[in-house]
Amino acid sequence: MLMYGDFAGMYDPLMKDVDYDSWAEYLLRFLGDEKLRVTDCACGTGEITLRLARAGHIMTGVDISGDMLRIASEKARRAALKIPFVEQDMRKLALHRPQDAIICACDGVNYLDSLKAAEEFFEAANAALKVGGLLLFDISSQYKLENILGCNTFAE
């Protein structure tokens, strides 16, 4: 994950076509209107974290890249949102209190490099959730990775 140090400054321009508003709207359908304590794992530069905070949720952003989190923190500061951003490996979540929900959007789980790493994340997320809490995540399937993305290059 060290690659995100140099990459952090280029991440948002490269991801400009991601529809973060739709992502947030989709997640909000599951989270509902009640103010929840939510942790966004693999939050990157905080785009989804910020949107869910604006919707009224008590957010924490977690990412392994301090450089990505510095950008996320600056965005939150400019938006006058108080969001703690924590540099840690999502496989070893160490949160101060149980969470109502944990999210890991935009293929964050796909960045884990083994089945064991994924299991560690799911176990850590389960331990960090309140009883009955929600874990919301998405993944790109092996079919998508091999047959849709494959060895294709996507560029403008």
What do these predicted ranges mean?
Residues 1-36, 47, 134-156:
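Conserved class I S-adenosyl-L-methionine
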Residues 42-46:
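Class I SAM-dependent methyltransferase "Motif I" SAM/SAH-binding loop
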Residues 47-92:
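Class I SAM-dependent methyltransferase SAM/SAH-binding core
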Residues 94-101:
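A short acidic, Gly/Pro-enriched loop at the edge of an enzyme's catalytic core
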Residues 105-107:
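Residues lining the SAM
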Residues 119-131:
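A short glycine-rich, Lys/Arg-flanked "PGG" loop and its adjoining helix->strand segment in the class I
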